């Protein structure tokens, strides 16, 4: 089991039970005592839990209950359409692009109107939208793996092994929150896959609506300063000024 998978399992367990013991985590995850203690120390550093004798106690910070795919589709619709249209202007003929999961990225998939393109995605809805546009010069690839139902995206070792062999001219992705320089999401595993894809893209564009600016989530997985640009509907001058310290803003 990879580290990000262990951290996610431990987080789920401790937030369900309130407290956990090292011995029960060792037995549940089939890893060493030392590995569990290192994981608990890392999660303590993230503010997820507090170490106590023989185990840990939840800090109950996992208060950001991730919305379902259907709920996300009903929020900030006009704003997401605006962002998707702006992002679509950056897609060029001949590009090889990676599209991550997220309802705003799905809207981008609908907006794409190029005829010579290669698109790779780990998101089932994005693939379903783009597969309607396939041709000899418009190719769409879906990465398989373990399905994360809440975002309908594929994650895990199989997904990541395939990703390691790929390179992209551009990547468009989203997140659940942006705070300071940090881009945040709810899942270690999904974050790991997103970060891996970002490392293989030349240009990197974050699609984020104004409701997510200033919002925290469970784990940080990328920094604004590493982006090519952030695409948003936000018109708040104060927020835009703060964001522009880290990256270019397209709005």
Curated annotation (Swiss-Prot):
Q: Some GO term, biological process aspect, for this entry: which one?
A: lactose metabolic process
Q: Which InterPro entries match?
A: Carb_Metab_HTH_regulators, DeoR-like_C, DeoR_HTH, NagB/RpiA_transferase-like, Tscrpt_reg_HTH_DeoR_CS, WH-like_DNA-bd_sf, WH_DNA-bd_sf
Q: Which residues carry the record's DNA-binding region feature?
A: 20-39
Spell out the molecular function terms from Gene Ontology: DNA binding; DNA-binding transcription factor activity
Which residues does the UniProt record annotate as the domain HTH deoR-type?
3-58
Sorted alphabetically, which keywords does the UniProt record give?
Answer: DNA-binding, Lactose metabolism, Repressor, Transcription, Transcription regulation
Function per UniProt = Repressor of the lactose catabolism operon. Galactose-6-phosphate is the inducer.
The identity of this protein, by name, is Lactose phosphotransferase system repressor
Origin organism is Streptococcus mutans serotype c (strain ATCC 700610 / UA159)
What is this protein's gene name? lacR
């Amino acid at each position: 089991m990879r580290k990000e998978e262990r951290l996610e399992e431990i987080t789920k367990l401790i937030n369900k039970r309130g407290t956990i013991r090292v011995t029960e985590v060792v037995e549940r995850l089939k890893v060493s005592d030392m590995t569990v203690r290192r994981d608990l120390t890392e999660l303590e550093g993230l503010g997820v839990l507090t170490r106590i004798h023989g185990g840990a106690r939840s800090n109950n910070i996992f208060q950001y209950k991730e919305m379902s795919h259907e709920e996300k589709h009903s929020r900030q619709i006009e704003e997401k359409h605006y962002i998707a249209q702006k992002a679509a202007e950056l897609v060029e003929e001949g590009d090889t692009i990676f599209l991550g999961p997220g309802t705003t990225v799905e809207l981008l998939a609908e907006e794409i109107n190029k005829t010579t393109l290669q698109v790779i995605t780990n998101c089932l809805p994005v693939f379903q939208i783009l597969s309607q546009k396939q041709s000899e010069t418009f190719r769409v690839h879906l990465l398989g793996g373990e399905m994360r139902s809440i975002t309908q995206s594929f994650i895990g070792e199989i997904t990541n092994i395939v990703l390691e062999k790929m390179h992209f001219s551009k990547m468009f992705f989203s997140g659940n929150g942006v705070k300071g320089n940090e881009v945040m999401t709810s899942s270690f595993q999904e974050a790991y896959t997103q970060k891996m894809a970002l490392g293989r893209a030349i240009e990197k564009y974050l699609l984020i609506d104004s409701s997510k600016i200033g919002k925290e989530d469970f784990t940080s997985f990328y920094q604004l300063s590493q982006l090519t640009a952030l695409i948003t509907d936000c018109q708040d001058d104060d927020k835009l000024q703060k964001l522009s310290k880290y990256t270019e803003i397209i709005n």
